[in-house]
UniProtKB/Swiss-Prot annotation:
It catalyses: a ganglioside GM2 (d18:1(4E)) + UDP-alpha-D-galactose = a ganglioside GM1 (d18:1(4E)) + UDP + H(+); a ganglioside GM2 + UDP-alpha-D-galactose = a ganglioside GM1 + UDP + H(+); a ganglioside GD2 (d18:1(4E)) + UDP-alpha-D-galactose = a ganglioside GD1b (d18:1(4E)) + UDP + H(+); a ganglioside GA2 (d18:1(4E)) + UDP-alpha-D-galactose = a ganglioside GA1 (d18:1(4E)) + UDP + H(+). Residues 1-4 are cytoplasmic. It comes from Rattus norvegicus (Rat). It is found in: Golgi apparatus membrane. The chain crosses the membrane at residues 5-25. This is Beta-1,3-galactosyltransferase 4.
Amino acid sequence: MPLSLFRRLLLAVLLLVIIWTLFGPSGLGEELLSLSLASLLPAPASPGPPLALPRLLIPNPQACGGSGPPPFLLILVCTAPEHLNQRNAIRGSWGAIREARGFRVQTLFLLGEPMGQQFADLASESAAQGDVLQASFQDSYRNLTLKTLTGLNWVNKYCPMARYILKTDDDVYVNVPELVSELIQRGGPSEQWQKGKEPQEETTAVHKEHKGQAVPLLYLGRVHWRVRPTRTPESRHHVSEELWPENWGPFPPYASGTGYVLSISAVQLILKVASRAPYLPLEDVFVGVSARRVGLAPTHCVKLAGATHYPLDRCCYGKFLLTSHKVDPWKMQEAWKLVRGLNGRRTEPFCSWLQGFLGTLRCRFIAWLNS
């Protein structure tokens, strides 16, 4: 084979590898592309009037308290009143984690009013578990925006010292340790959330070491691009032309509602402009629209599953994925046993050398085969 032909073939192979890496299942190209979104955003909008939100029936104001430091990661799980099995599955698996990588983690469940049920069961559950937040609105899919805003407003009022907030659903498995690691890697000072600091020491450290220092903005998730509203009235994703006129074009980029992370500073900015945004029943789109109004672009993270369900796999669930969608209560427990071991302690590596080398690509390929 002539040398020039060999070089051409080698160059073609290298080019294919680069294209595959950037635009294939790895998602690296999407992550790089999302970094350019901030430069395309309009100037931030002015704050709107205070939000009119439903009153809290179970406010649980002390849920974020305690003798230790405030949560580094606060997880808000949107759930329905009747989904007790899902909540208990989370409590018995990843929701039981209170500390990851030396930082405090807190998981709370967010819901509205049950239909045709008494409140006594939820009140008893809240008294026993201490992790329920309930507000006075009808719990339904079309009220997810109201539910999410209520949760974010609770965070801003009762837990403003939390650093990151993950909004997720009760059919999502969350890899808490790896998510905390991901957030640590994405930067920002974290000394005030160090393990073991007393509240008084922590407050002093914050004022001395970080006075005048802005909390880094972050809106992280599985980003959807150029999604147009669904006009079919029967669809639960239906958005009327009154809410989103056709001449407005597609929705701005937004992170999938199955799991996205907001820094506390991003939460506060979104709450300031939310009353001026069109009230869309699709909460993830609404958050994306509100974020755009404050000049905040979503950052794509391929490790967050979005709507993708991943089959149970020790390497994927334990190392490379941060979330997996459509996980029922039984599989939630199975995933936990797979990752943690029957005795609750991991005694061997999650991944073989080859699995580790292939990383997220392998997990996405498994999901594709399963679909």
